[in-house]
Amino acid sequence: MLPYATAAEAEAALGRAMTAAESLWFRYSAGIPDYVLFWHNILFLFVVFTLAPLPVALLELRAPAAVGPFKLQPKVRLSREEFFRCYRDVMRLFFLVIGPLQLVSYPTVKMVGIHTGLPLPSLGEMAAQLLVYFLVEDYLNYWIHRLLHGEWGYEKIHRVHHEFTAPIGFAAPYAHWAEVLILGIPSFVGPALAPGHMITFWLWIVLRQMEAIETHSGFDFPFNLTKYIPFYGGAEYHDYHHYVGRQSQSNFASVFTYCDYLYGTDKGYRYHKAYQAKMKALGQTEGEKADSNGLSYAKLD
């Protein structure tokens, strides 16, 4: 809740006139408690989990021939019932774990210094903070994800997420409840190290989940803008990890690829890409053995 009763008081405190964005923020948030503003994340996550995967899912279900050339595992076709079951299970997880976690997290958010006041951050400041959040979360997520591929972590927790060997967007948050709690920690570390405005935090949560949904989409569209982000993994990169499954010691990265490269956990993927290029050059001769999903992984690592 902003400590100003009127716009004039806010401008007096700022020592200048509010920008259009600040005026809009003042009108919306002045009378809303900070914890309620933070709880907006619950609504944002619900909308993202429900709507962001929907366009690709509808294309896959209603126009499979049109999007078939871009599907990473073309022989895997999920039914409408399987899509709905995934969404239903994600919503159960959302209402029992993710939503309640947001409700009780506000004291931590307040403690680290995420604020709702004026002035609003500049676009440059927001971009810099978001970059920090992505880099920090990606690094920590890499190591936690790698640990979850140990025997105990996989069998007890992470195997749930890998039930979808050919991932779909709705399956991005599909996981064991313990994994949701564990992997939620890296998402808060970046904002704790570089605390910013609540709007930046909202944007971070939304962008991170949309990135995860894109990565799990199961499609590699040539027009995707993420292809222009340096070191970005994307759907094709992460699809390999899901296909190989438990035995995979490759492609642990959640967003960028630098950790896999630095720590040598992309060797299987690079071998696979080299093998694909070789087979393509040979015209996909009989030496290539494709699996039932339409893929040809010569080496699983």
Curated annotation (Swiss-Prot):
It comes from the Eukaryota. One of its GO terms (molecular function) is C-4 methylsterol oxidase activity. The keyword Oxidoreductase does not apply. GO terms for biological process: sterol biosynthetic process. Expressed ubiquitously. Residues 131-265 form the Fatty acid hydroxylase domain. It catalyses: a long-chain fatty aldehyde + 2 NADPH + O2 + H(+) = a long-chain alkane + formate + 2 NADP(+) + H2O. One of its GO terms (cellular component) is endoplasmic reticulum membrane. Its main location: endoplasmic reticulum. It is a multi-pass membrane protein. Keywords: Endoplasmic reticulum, Lyase, Membrane, NADP, Transmembrane, Transmembrane helix. Its EC number is 4.1.99.5. The chain crosses the membrane at residues 36-56, 94-114, 187-207. It is found in: Endoplasmic reticulum membrane. Belongs to the sterol desaturase family. Aldehyde decarbonylase involved in the conversion of aldehydes to alkanes. Core component of a very-long-chain alkane synthesis complex. Homodimer. This is Very-long-chain aldehyde decarbonylase GL1-10.
